[in-house]
Amino acid sequence: MSEFQKLVIIDAKGHLMGRLASTVAKQLLAGQKVVVVRCEELNISGHFFRNKLKYLAYLRKACRYNPSRGAFHFRAPSRIFTKAVRGMLPHKTTRGNIALKNLQALEGIPPPFDKQKRLVVPAALRVLRLKPSRKYCTIGRLSSEVGWKYKNIVSKLEERRKIKSAAFYQAKSANQKHINVAKTKSSVNEKLAVFGY
């Protein structure tokens, strides 16, 4: 993401949440519009049980005499990621608020973005940043165990999308093979050159 683009779509699968959030926050402050898809596949370092206990303790933080006043805790992976990014932005200022509005976090890869190019952030990838022996867990599992109800729906939709994209890729690669074969046939090219092609 060294150059400015109209819209950056990041595939969050296999990224560490905090590291990805810091990179995204930096881009948002620079004026970039960012869409983060597959937030349920984000990773958090540390054992799952430890992270669950920490999150349950976080959910208990509320106003004693009127819990409806706040603090408000989100269960959906996209909202958890958005709140992580918000903590890295000056969201109470106009500049920070505008930056936060340029972020869109989603579970799965919904239709407008499934046919567009998606990027990864090498500085935030778990395989490059975490020791192989270290424990980690996904936000999708954590969210589903603390109250997120849509894990099954998102996984079904993702399975459908993967089947469609695999079929599209096979058709595209078969078409590309024909193009490559056509390019290598020199006799045909010589005949076409006679006619000015």
From Swiss-Prot:
Named from the GO MF annotations, one term is: mRNA binding
Compartments (UniProt record): Cytoplasm; Nucleus, Nucleolus
A Gene Ontology cellular component where this protein is annotated is: nucleolus
Task: Supply the PROSITE patterns for this chain.
Answer: RIBOSOMAL_L13
Keyword Mitochondrion included in the entry's annotation: no
Task: Alphabetically list the UniProt keywords.
Answer: Cytoplasm, Nucleus, Ribonucleoprotein, Ribosomal protein
UniProt entry tagged with the keyword Cytoplasm:
yes
GO BP terms: namely: cytoplasmic translation; negative regulation of translation
Q: Which HAMAP family match?
A: Ribosomal_uL13
- What else does UniProt say about it? There are 3 genes for uL13 in S.pombe.
What does the UniProt record say this protein does?
Component of the ribosome, a large ribonucleoprotein complex responsible for the synthesis of proteins in the cell. The small ribosomal subunit (SSU) binds messenger RNAs (mRNAs) and translates the encoded message by selecting cognate aminoacyl-transfer RNA (tRNA) molecules. The large subunit (LSU) contains the ribosomal catalytic site termed the peptidyl transferase center (PTC), which catalyzes the formation of peptide bonds, thereby polymerizing the amino acids delivered by tRNAs into a polypeptide chain.
Subunit structure of this chain's protein: Component of the large ribosomal subunit (LSU). Mature yeast ribosomes consist of a small (40S) and a large (60S) subunit. The 40S small subunit contains 1 molecule of ribosomal RNA (18S rRNA) and at least 33 different proteins. The large 60S subunit contains 3 rRNA molecules (25S, 5.8S and 5S rRNA) and at least 46 different proteins.
Q: Which family does it belong to?
A: Belongs to the universal ribosomal protein uL13 family.
Q: In its UniProt entry, what is this protein called?
A: Large ribosomal subunit protein uL13C
Q: Which organism is it from?
A: Schizosaccharomyces pombe (strain 972 / ATCC 24843) (Fission yeast)
